[in-house]
UniProtKB/Swiss-Prot annotation:
The keyword Cytoplasm applies. Involved in excretory canal elongation during postembryonic development. Plays a role in promoting Golgi stability, ER integrity and vesicle transport probably by regulating the activation of Rho GTPase cdc-42. Involved in fertility. Transmembrane segments: none annotated. It comes from the Eukaryota. Keywords: Cell membrane, Cytoplasm, Membrane. This is Programmed cell death protein 10 homolog. Its main location: cytoplasm. One of its GO terms (molecular function) is protein kinase binding. The gene is ccm-3. One of its GO terms (biological process) is positive regulation of endocytic recycling. Expressed in pharynx, intestine, germline, vulva and excretory canals.
Length: 215
């Protein structure tokens, strides 16, 4: 698995297939046979994702290659984060806890504001305003992570701290990529860095969920 397949692969079901599946389910909600078939397909896709996070990504690339469509996957994924489901950013079983709710809120906000990057890069003023919002969202998410760190079980703290350090690392990388962009105008590299930051945001919540399930 290459690096792109790693972070985009892990987001493929949530970003691409889940919204499509939900739309089709709604269209056929009055057809029991169709609903049963769609549920089986949903189970098969999620099983594939769990067994091999890059499978759906690789499958999507094959479909695109066979259809001879030219699609910038980095930009497309980033745009889709604006409307993709957010259940992967919820701390399951702790939805009413103020600190976990704040973490979810800030994670969603960061993902949504990052999704605006491709649309606004061509307008320097709008892009600079979006960059300010991203910086503010990163700061608020870090504050939420610190608050959650204090209430998770002691056994979970090292893993949360590790994810936080990785998030900070990719936040700095994103900042450096933006500085470079204003010199070389490499828009795709900005999308790459933004997607990596979205992935790190997801991994923070995923790690917290895993540690809380284990107690």
């Amino acid at each position: 698995m290459n690096e792109e397949g790693g972070y985009l692969g892990a987001m493929t079901y949530q970003c691409l297939y889940s919204p499509v599946m939900e739309k089709i389910k709604q269209q056929h909600r009055d057809d029991p046979r169709a609903s049963l078939a769609l549920n089986k397909l949903h189970t098969a896709l999620t099983t594939c994702e769990q067994a091999s996070p890059s499978f759906l990504y690789d499958f999507t690339k094959v479909l695109l290659d066979d259809s001879e469509l030219s699609v910038n996957l980095q930009e497309s994924y980033l745009r889709m984060h604006d409307t993709s489901p957010t259940n992967d950013l919820i701390v399951s079983g702790y939805e009413q806890n103020a600190d976990y709710k704040e973490l979810t809120k800030r994670a969603i906000e960061l993902r949504r504001v990052l999704s605006r990057v491709p649309e606004e890069m061509s307008d320097r003023h709008a892009f600079l305003e979006t960059i300010k919002l991203i910086a503010s969202s990163i700061k608020k998410l870090l504050e939420a992570i610190n608050a959650v760190y204090r209430i998770v079980p002691l056994t979970a703290q090292p893993a949360v701290e590790k994810r936080k350090r990785e998030f900070v690392h990719y936040s700095k990388r994103f900042s450096n990529t933006l500085k470079t962009y204003f010199k070389d105008q490499n828009a795709n590299q900005v999308s790459v860095s933004a997607n990596q930051l979205v992935f790190q945001t997801t991994m923070i919540v995923r790690t917290i969920n895993e540690k809380l399930r284990r107690g």
